[in-house]
């Protein structure tokens, strides 16, 4: 569990959007009970989605998962140690680009996929209609992280196997098993569609400043909410509370 949480923290969310917003954008509710006290909360909604290279909050994702559209379940092998991130230099092990190296531009952990810039591409036709033949575009197909790629050792720029180890400072890093060189996680992994790096982000009018977010405004007290209101409004309780018993 700790390793999974660590890797999840390393795999930054490219959307930079609240998780609740993403879940709400892809949610498909077919039926639910009224919000009345005489009804039990029951909801019939879609729970199985087909994940592809389209982001879950986009219209293309919803088009591929239209309501009442049933698709065959895709069996995914769980990856306990997710080790590929945006910006990694990898070597392709299969296909027409076998032996070539490229940079990871997109990570799809739901399918154990990565997209490599300029590799494993093909042509496809889009926008075809009755009176328009459409256009041909170049599209990069995903590669499987368990069978199709491997990391490149930064010391000699050759493909290598690796393992996770701890440094003397307690930091968990990827280490090449051939040379012992640390393979750092690229800074590109912190990139979102809002900024390249967190330090380069320019605050907008509706953004809450970091100083305000980090300010401690909660003062822990033993008094209840009602007691705090009475204290602020100068109300003094002069009644004697009745005795209560625990059984």
Curated annotation (Swiss-Prot):
Residue ranges of domain KOW in the record: 84-117
Keywords: Mitochondrion, Ribonucleoprotein, Ribosomal protein, Transit peptide
Top-level lineage group: Eukaryota
Record GO terms (molecular function): RNA binding; structural constituent of ribosome
Subcellular localization(s) per the UniProt record: Mitochondrion
InterPro entries: KOW (IPR005824), Rib_uL2_dom2 (IPR014722), Ribosomal_uL24 (IPR003256), Ribosomal_uL24_CS (IPR005825), Ribosomal_uL24_KOW (IPR041988), Translation_prot_SH3-like_sf (IPR008991)
UniProt main location, coarse: mitochondrion
One GO cellular component term noted in the UniProt record for this chain: mitochondrial large ribosomal subunit
Pfam family name, one: KOW
Biological process according to GO: translation
Quaternary structure, from the entry: Component of the mitochondrial ribosome large subunit (39S) which comprises a 16S rRNA and about 50 distinct proteins.
Family matches, as NCBIfam families: rplX_bact (TIGR01079)
Family assignment from sequence similarity: Belongs to the universal ribosomal protein uL24 family.
Protein name: Large ribosomal subunit protein uL24m
Source organism of the structure: Drosophila pseudoobscura pseudoobscura
